[in-house]
Amino acid sequence: MGNQHSLLNKEQLEQMKDNSSFSEAELKKLYRRFQMLDKDGSGTLTTDEFLSIPDLALNPLLERVIQIFDQNKDNEIEFFEFVGTLATLSHKGTKEDKLKFLFQIYDIDCDGFISNGELFQVLKMMVGTNLNDVQLQQIVDKTIIEGDYDKDGKISFDEFIHMIGNQEGIEEKLSVNWSE
């Protein structure tokens, strides 16, 4: 099965070039990396294959990141999904796209809002046992109160942008150099 995925055809390359900020040479390089990560040669990446990357394996939000990569929600990352997310996180990605990606990390149920419970879950992933649940809930409550401008009990994307969009260096913090 892995053989049928060994080459990108010209049409696929052109489509990905049109839909991303990557050149043909960059796409070919990314495809070679993708194939190296695809240990079983299936043409897709599984969570376990992502976890085999030492730098990513330690990331407490890796499961959420993988869920966002997996746009069609089939529990596998196809190359086009891989490219789409990497394009967002590359230095060529727009600030708005990067902030949408970050918002998606917190918006676990994909309803367009960050609820108190979702914020708690994501922060719990990040802090682990460094804070107890009461301390963490206090931070969550304070964040929701400060960021919920329309007072509906949740954070919309616009409110999220208002809260963090103007932080100095946010775009750089959400950029990864994939060309190395």
UniProtKB/Swiss-Prot annotation:
Positions with a binding annotation for Ca(2+) 4: 148, 150, 152, 154, 159
Segments passing through the bilayer: none
Binding residue positions for Ca(2+) 2: 70, 72, 74, 76, 81
Residue numbers marked as site, Interaction with PxVP motif in substrates of the catalytic subunit: 125
MF term (GO), any: protein phosphatase binding
Domain of life: Eukaryota
Residues that hold Ca(2+) 1 according to the record: 38, 40, 42, 44, 49
UniProt keywords, alphabetically: Calcium, Lipoprotein, Metal-binding, Myristate, Repeat
Residue numbers spanned by region canA/calcineurin A binding: 138-143
GO terms classed as biological process: calcineurin-mediated signaling; positive regulation of sorocarp stalk cell differentiation; response to cation stress
GO cellular component, one term: calcineurin complex
Residues with a covalently attached lipid (N-myristoyl glycine): 2
Family indicated by similarity: Belongs to the calcineurin regulatory subunit family.
Known role: Regulatory subunit of calcineurin, a calcium-dependent, calmodulin stimulated protein phosphatase. Confers calcium sensitivity. Important for stalk formation.
PANTHER family documented for this protein: PROTEIN PHOSPATASE 3 REGULATORY SUBUNIT B ALPHA ISOFORM TYPE 1
Subunit structure and binding partners: Forms a complex composed of a calmodulin-dependent catalytic subunit canA (also known as calcineurin A) and a regulatory Ca(2+)-binding subunit cnbA (also known as calcineurin B).
Descriptive protein name: Calcineurin subunit B type 1
Source organism per UniProt: Dictyostelium discoideum
